[in-house]
């Protein structure tokens, strides 16, 4: 009897072990749970349904759990739209099940590629918020494949270690009115308060862009976002320019311009989609653009200027923040088609103040400054450095330094206000004129007055301008309400090709940018003198006295 009982128990144990082995290795396939699962979903939301195939059960001896898996299920929304899935799987803890606790340990869902609109409609049936309505309006089309990993605690709540991953394919998103991102593709990974996007590709205004990463991290009630954006060399269009710059850029011709860029950015985004603390670091290369600028001032110096400046190999490094904008740039520029020159510049904007530094290489430009008898020939090394700032209506050139071989022109603290000179601290001329005469003079400010001193100066233009105070060409009208005394001490002044005067001494009283008094003395030699006097009378009439022992240098130039 005992032997039979023992034999029976042994058979039962063997069968039980075989059953456990079978369940753990092969599993059990059934469809008995399908109606139960469908009923549970219907009770949660009557607009949702699920199409299940057979469910497979696997026994996990190591974790004392049962793994439930089903292949190719479909979630049906309002009997029409479908979300097709590759697999749904879950683990049920046996110990929790028998203790009547929440037994589901985890839930894994792997979808197929479905229309993004279907995912949105599914979510709307669960939580129809304003944000999801806005997202639905912005997304025009596209597909997505999504993987969901959820872990549950003993009370059935989702743990914070959830994971949402997948990829978006060929999406279209409206970013502005009539502006759409096309062919949008990216991979994504979402977990607790962190959103990561990688391998981002899209097309905007027919230009291909890509991004290696875009990270979003939730902090309290805001999101911190950082990422990068790139594009390979492609042809630019006006829509791109207008979307970046609000100013009128009609003076630029971008018709043949190709560009490439690399940008890194970070900012904070509130729940109301307000951007704060935006910072952008961009490197931008423009192969060619044309500046259309009609300027008579430029033509006064460069005779063959045709209102076009061709800019090539343009490189810009732009750093933007709310507090400051910094631009470093360089270009090759062409005024004559076959002769290139270069420019390097830095611009910094803080509030209403704009600081600038510029270095121009002018080797291959020929130009002249007629008022000071200066002429530069082509292929002669020359540089121009300019440093200053603009603040509201005030424009200050802290330093202007022009160098060409042994020639040098320096201007310090030249202040422009309302298109007129309101101040200048120093002007230095040290160059050989086009008449092969050395110009060596300095204009120096002392308190509110000036001294013009030097060894030599090749021009009578200064005397002509001073003497012409009653005409429309009054030299001092370029100044803003100038009220100063000017003392002039120049050893030698060239009047024309054959005449010079020595020891030119003058004293000027300037009031409201006009000559009030002038006394000028000089000599051709010991016996030949030059004297000019201008006196303003009490009735505001002007008495001018002129004497020269040589008439020839002045007969054609001086207006009696």
Report each predicted region and the residues it spans.
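Extracellular/periplasmic ligand-binding regions of membrane signal-transduction receptors
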Residues: 65-75
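Classical Sec-dependent N-terminal signal peptides that target proteins to the secretory pathway
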Residues: 3-22, 192
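Membrane-proximal interfacial segments on either side of biological membranes
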Residues: 2-7, 30-66, 88-560
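Membrane-interface motif at the C-terminal end of an N-terminal transmembrane signal
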Residues: 16-34
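A short, flexible beta-alpha/helix-coil linker loop
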Residues: 19-21, 76, 171
